[in-house]
Amino acid sequence: MAKKVVGYIKLQIPAGKANPSPPVGPALGQRGLNIMQFCKEFNAKTQQLEPGMPIPVVITAYADRTFSFITKTPPNTYFLLKAAKISKGSQTVGKSAAVGSVTTAQLREIAETKFKDMNANDIDGAVRMLAGSAKSMGLNVVEG
């Protein structure tokens, strides 16, 4: 028989850096889950990734106070900022000059990495979604 699910917890945690401090500790503590066990398992699962890379995680809490979790690919903004070699997007999109640029080849590469977590039917659709995200961050999309 399947375990009874009591809730889902969605967090974004840096790869290999889960610890009991907020936001992880309070979120898991409210459901009565073992915080240290989660931190050890998450850090072990993400140790091969670039340290500090933000990893979205969905934790499923069960009635018997056990849990399971699924890691997803980092957010689009992380990849776009990395491709443009900048630290943050524009604060005034459309009013000031673009803060950087990304090529369509870079967008295609990001789309291939992110495709399984995106709500797109094909790679071209994913590229268009990423182009929209880039534009809203103040990045120019150039052919190449």
From Swiss-Prot:
Cite the InterPro entries for this sequence: Ribosomal_uL11, Ribosomal_uL11_bac-typ, Ribosomal_uL11_C, Ribosomal_uL11_C_sf, Ribosomal_uL11_CS, Ribosomal_uL11_N, Ribosomal_uL11_N_sf
Q: Output the GO biological process annotations, alphabetical, semicolon-separated.
A: translation
- Alphabetically list the UniProt keywords: Methylation, Ribonucleoprotein, Ribosomal protein, RNA-binding, rRNA-binding
One cellular component (GO) term of this entry: cytosolic large ribosomal subunit
List the GO molecular function terms: large ribosomal subunit rRNA binding; structural constituent of ribosome
Question: rRNA-binding: is it a keyword of this entry?
Answer: yes
Q: How is it modified after translation?
A: One or more lysine residues are methylated.
Q: Which family does it belong to?
A: Belongs to the universal ribosomal protein uL11 family.
Chain's role: Forms part of the ribosomal stalk which helps the ribosome interact with GTP-bound translation factors.
Q: How does it assemble?
A: Part of the ribosomal stalk of the 50S ribosomal subunit. Interacts with L10 and the large rRNA to form the base of the stalk. L10 forms an elongated spine to which L12 dimers bind in a sequential fashion forming a multimeric L10(L12)X complex.
Q: Which named protein is this?
A: Large ribosomal subunit protein uL11
Q: Which organism is it from?
A: Gluconobacter oxydans (strain 621H)
Gene that this sequence comes from: rplK
